[in-house]
Curated annotation (Swiss-Prot):
Location(s), subcellular: Cytoplasm
Lineage: Bacteria, Pseudomonadati, Pseudomonadota, Gammaproteobacteria, Pseudomonadales
SUBUNIT field: Homodimer.
Family under the similarity heading: Belongs to the triosephosphate isomerase family.
Coiled-coil residues: none
Nucleotide-binding as UniProt keyword: no
Catalytic activity, EC: 5.3.1.1
Name of the molecule in the record: Triosephosphate isomerase
Organism the protein comes from: Pseudomonas fluorescens (strain Pf0-1)
Enzyme class: isomerase
Functional pathway: Carbohydrate biosynthesis; gluconeogenesis; Carbohydrate degradation; glycolysis; D-glyceraldehyde 3-phosphate from glycerone phosphate: step 1/1
Pfam families in the cross-refs: TIM
Amino acid sequence: MRRPMVAGNWKMHGTRASVAELINGLRHLALPSGVDVAVFPPCLYINQVIDGLKGKSISVGAQNSAVESMQGALTGEIAPSQLVDAGCSLVLVGHSERRQIMGERDGMLNRKFAAAQACGLIPVLCVGETLEQREAGKTLEVVGRQLGSIIEELGVGAFANAVIAYEPVWAIGTGLTATPQQAQDVHKAIREQLAAENSEVARGVRLLYGGSVKAANAVELFGMPDIDGGLIGGASLNADEFGAICRAAGN
């Protein structure tokens, strides 16, 4: 049985004051015991969040990390080893905003994924298609290629200690949401692609859905057989809304 997971991606939001307020809200949440909960704050506030959430069952991750696992001469980057030293346990890899805006390609993301795992971080690989690609009927082709790049270079076994998040680009921050069945269809295809290589890995890996998830639609989304939780954007900036989504995953 896969343990549900809800992860909050705070993106480039927050000040020390607003982060402190959000931490306080999270500390007062009654979270379901059967759900893994994580937050991904901006790197400047990672230490503040880790310190503020001590004693609370909420893991802290980073939104990005370097292609090299150890510290060195790579200006502006943060090594996975440094994230571990700071207290992080997870890192996002390949979020659509990194792919679309920062131009990160599969080869670079393979290196980031491997570097993170080499340091003991759990990578959360983000995959998803644009609206143009969906309308052209290329959703499974695009997602399959993004997933297949990791499998080809690192082997399917790399997903034994990783999480996959399907985030249709057209549903991120737009208010649009894939229907539960649309999301399930892609999640099922992802699991089948993994199963073609290793059925045990496929059964065990957690697949999260991201794309305008809210408390109002979380129950129906999380009720799908291959959706194991969510990667939450804007709704994770409101502690009460985030808590409601976590409880939906627990149900």
